[in-house]
């Protein structure tokens, strides 16, 4: 066994909260731009992630930073780290 205890870098992404109807869980929409293979035009692609929100602090429209964690349920393996900007009320 080696004594190398290198820490694995956790994936962190930013996205917008689109649903907070579940208890302690929010749905975060993460958008990215990819270049089309043939035409070279940049296209928006999006992914919806379920993230753990322990304090139920996030509202719809908030921009949040989430990080990857060990699976908490079938679909939830992200955790809200911070709320970057709050939604206008």
Swiss-Prot record:
GO terms for cellular component: cytosolic small ribosomal subunit. InterPro entries: NA-bd_OB-fold, Ribosomal_uS17, Ribosomal_uS17_bact/chlr. Keywords: Ribonucleoprotein, Ribosomal protein, RNA-binding, rRNA-binding. GO terms for biological process: translation. One of its GO terms (molecular function) is rRNA binding. It holds the Pfam family Ribosomal_S17. One of the primary rRNA binding proteins, it binds specifically to the 5'-end of 16S ribosomal RNA. Part of the 30S ribosomal subunit. Belongs to the universal ribosomal protein uS17 family. This is Small ribosomal subunit protein uS17. It comes from Stenotrophomonas maltophilia (strain K279a).
């Amino acid at each position: 066994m080696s004594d190398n205890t290198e820490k694995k870098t956790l994936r962190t992404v930013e996205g917008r909260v689109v649903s907070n109807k579940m208890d302690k869980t929010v749905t975060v929409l993460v958008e990215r731009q990819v270049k089309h293979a043939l035409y070279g035009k940049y296209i928006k692609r999006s992914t919806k992630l379920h993230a753990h929100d322990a304090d139920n602090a996030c509202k719809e429209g908030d921009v949040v930073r989430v990080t990857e964690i060990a699976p908490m349920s079938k679909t939830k393996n992200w955790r809200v780290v911070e709320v970057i900007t709050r939604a206008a009320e």
